[in-house]
Regions:
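...captures the hydrophobic TM-helix bundle architecture rather than a specific catalytic motif
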Residues: 1-198
Length: 198
């Protein structure tokens, strides 16, 4: 008499809930998206309604190079997080520092543009409606880039001290979510201000 074999149905794979850090960052991104939406709508609403100049067409130059720098930083931080998850800490640190460099170049480009607009064209936040909405929208984004760079720099300091390992890969992934958000917002700002707005 042969022993009967019992077959069991395939059990569904366990469903892992996202970490609290990812949930919190997702909530922050949703809230920040609402704020940026208000600023973008305000920019579009007041576009072309300035009584006095200068106008966007007269003074704005398309920051293609600095845009490429910022968008490229999304790739570098993505691969940096992947390297850390695989315990390739040397590559992680190199890509992380490259991300900071690219973000810093973008901020430099923003500062350079503001200097030109203020001192060559006399455009300040109180000059006209365009100045008010332009500096508010672009400044809001620059503030978020600055905040992101500060957080990236803190991680870099710990990384150079040898205190970042695969154990922190989850936190690094959460931080990369914020940086991807900042880059995605710039695509919208760039399109509205430098393409549609001109």
């Amino acid at each position: 008499m042969s022993a009967a074999t019992t077959s069991f149905p395939n059990r569904p794979a366990a469903w892992d809930l996202p970490s609290r850090g990812k949930v919190a960052m997702a909530g922050l991104i949703i809230a920040e998206s609402a704020i940026f939406t208000i600023f973008v709508v305000a920019y579009l609403f007041y576009l072309g309604k300035s009584i006095t100049g200068p106008t966007p067409r007269e003074v704005l130059e398309t920051p293609i190079f600095y845009t490429i720098c910022l968008l490229s930083s999304s790739l570098t931080i993505h691969f940096a997080a992947k390297c850390l998850a695989r315990s390739i800490t040397f590559a992680f640190l190199g890509l992380w520092l490259l991300t900071i460099t690219l973000g810093g170049l973008f901020l430099y480009g923003t500062a350079q543009e503001w200097h030109r607009l203020i001192y060559e064209h006399g455009l300040t936040i109180s000059t006209n409606l365009f100045g008010t909405t332009y500096y508010s929208l672009v400044g809001l984004h620059a503030f978020h880039v600055t905040a992101g760079l500060i957080m990236l720099a803190i991680v870099a300091v710990f990384g150079l001290a040898g205190r970042v390992s695969v154990k922190q890969s989850g936190r690094i992934e959460v931080l990369s979510m914020y940086w991807h958000f900042v880059d995605a917002v710039w695509v919208v700002v760039f399109t509205v201000v430098y393409l549609l707005g001109r």
